[in-house]
């Protein structure tokens, strides 16, 4: 930091905020510090008196942060920032063609994070067996063993299952899918909201992921599933009822903030410009 001499610092994780506290306390942090909370609810670990501004996911997050002692004038609701490409429309037909998927049939997407963790093979089997006969796409991340296992399955040989490794095309996959099964990380959920893909949150990790799932479920954009069977039931219900699926899509659209990254960048740059003009 001494070498780069920044005009401002933006943190998207609480650990650097904590690390910077001794410098601010010793008056050795002369630039503004901004914090972007990348979950849908506030957590006390983010709260430090030396933060000049918080950028948060929603009005609810802002209220929770205020209740934890942060002055309202230091909180701005922007949404959670993700890659701008998630806000660009690919088109369902084009997205499906990219992965060799059926242009009109149901498609279910299963994601287990970058490491492809969880009972992914069991989830795939349950979804493939549904009466609607969806094509199932499983993103295995860096779990090459899982990808090879799925590729050798009967469902893969008949074209009902596609197993992908780590991919930078999650935006296209979300647009291609009728429903996505995933964990409840703030960024992944924000991406699904922007693409308006109905989300089944599978076994969220206790703590922040559970709170994320509760927020999304209360907004009608997701369903929390505790078991593989619950996942299958929800996916079956949504695939069999396009009207219900469309309601979830509309709810997701209301919660989405596709321009959050640009909005936060603009606000930070404007604040830097104001500070320079005032000579502070």
Regions found by a protein language model. Give the residues of each.
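A short, well-ordered alpha-helix in the C-terminal region of glycosyltransferases
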Residues: 244-258
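A nucleotide-sugar donor-handling region in carbohydrate enzymes
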Residues: 52-114, 142, 146-148
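C-terminal "capping" alpha-helix adjacent to the active site of nucleotide-linked donor transferases
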Residues: 218-219, 227-244
């Amino acid at each position: 930091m001494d070498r780069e001499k920044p005009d401002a610092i933006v943190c998207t994780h609480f650990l650097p905020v904590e690390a910077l506290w001794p410098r601010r306390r010793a008056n050795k942090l002369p630039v503004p510090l901004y914090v972007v909370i990348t979950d849908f609810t506030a957590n006390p670990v983010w709260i430090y008196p030396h933060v000049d501004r918080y950028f948060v996911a929603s009005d609810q997050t802002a209220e929770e942060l205020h209740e934890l002692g942060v002055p309202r004038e230091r909180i701005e609701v922007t949404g959670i920032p993700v890659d701008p490409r998630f806000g660009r429309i690919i088109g369902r037909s084009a997205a499906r063609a990219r992965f060799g998927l059926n242009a009109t049939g149901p498609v279910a997407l299963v994601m287990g994070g970058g490491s492809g963790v969880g009972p992914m093979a069991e989830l795939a089997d349950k979804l493939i067996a549904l009466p609607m006969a969806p094509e199932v796409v499983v993103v295995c991340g860096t779990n090459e063993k899982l990808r090879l296992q799925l590729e050798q399955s009967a469902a893969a040989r008949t074209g009902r299952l596609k197993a992908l490794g780590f991919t930078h095309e999650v935006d296209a996959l979300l647009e291609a899918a009728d429903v996505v099964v995933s964990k409840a990380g703030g960024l992944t959920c924000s991406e699904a909201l922007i693409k308006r893909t109905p989300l089944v949150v599978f076994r969220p990790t206790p703590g922040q992921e559970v709170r994320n799932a509760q927020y999304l479920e209360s907004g009608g954009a997701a369903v929390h599933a505790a078991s593989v069977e619950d996942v299958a039931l929800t996916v079956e219900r949504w695939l069999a009822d396009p009207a219900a699926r469309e309601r979830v899509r509309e709810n997701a659209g209301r919660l989405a903030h596709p321009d959050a990254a640009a909005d936060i960048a603009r606000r930070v740059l404007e604040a830097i410009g104001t500070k320079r003009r005032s000579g502070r």
